[in-house]
């Protein structure tokens, strides 16, 4: 993260390590949702990039959150915003599934889904895409 960079996080199990592992010093910023509000990361990154042109903005988002509000990337395309979006793709609402497995072992419901081709989606929004598997 750049010395004045902004990191936006979405809700989800993938984001928890970021809270502990990424050191922040002013004027760096981390923008994250309260109470598990999925879909926060991408719109927050777009807003941060619009508000602070010239500052590096990186978004960490799960595939579930991306599918909820990822269409906001159209604004990034339209405005030529240099966002970096890192997507954790596991095909499930991980936090919800963990709670279901705890309360109803072996009976998760409605937590898995099939993603579109996220690499193709990123390219469609004009982003250079690198897949790490």
Segments (PLM) and residue ranges:
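Thiamine diphosphate
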Residues: 17-133
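Active-site pocket-lining segments that scaffold enzyme catalytic pockets across diverse folds
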Residues: 1-13
């Amino acid at each position: 993260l750049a010395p004045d960079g902004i990191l936006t996080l979405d809700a989800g199990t993938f984001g928890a390590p970021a809270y502990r592992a990424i050191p922040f010093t002013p004027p760096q910023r981390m923008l994250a949702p309260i109470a598990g509000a999925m879909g926060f990361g991408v719109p927050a990154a777009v807003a941060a990039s619009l508000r602070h042109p010239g500052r590096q903005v990186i978004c960490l988002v799960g595939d579930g959150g991306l599918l909820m509000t990822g269409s906001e990337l159209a604004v990034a395309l339209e405005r030529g915003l240099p966002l970096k979006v890192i997507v954790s793709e596991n095909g499930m609402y991980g936090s919800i599934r963990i709670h279901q497995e705890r309360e109803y072992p072996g009976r998760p419901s409605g937590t898995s889904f099939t993603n579109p081709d996220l690499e193709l989606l990123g390219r469609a929004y004009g982003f250079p895409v690198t897949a790490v598997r």
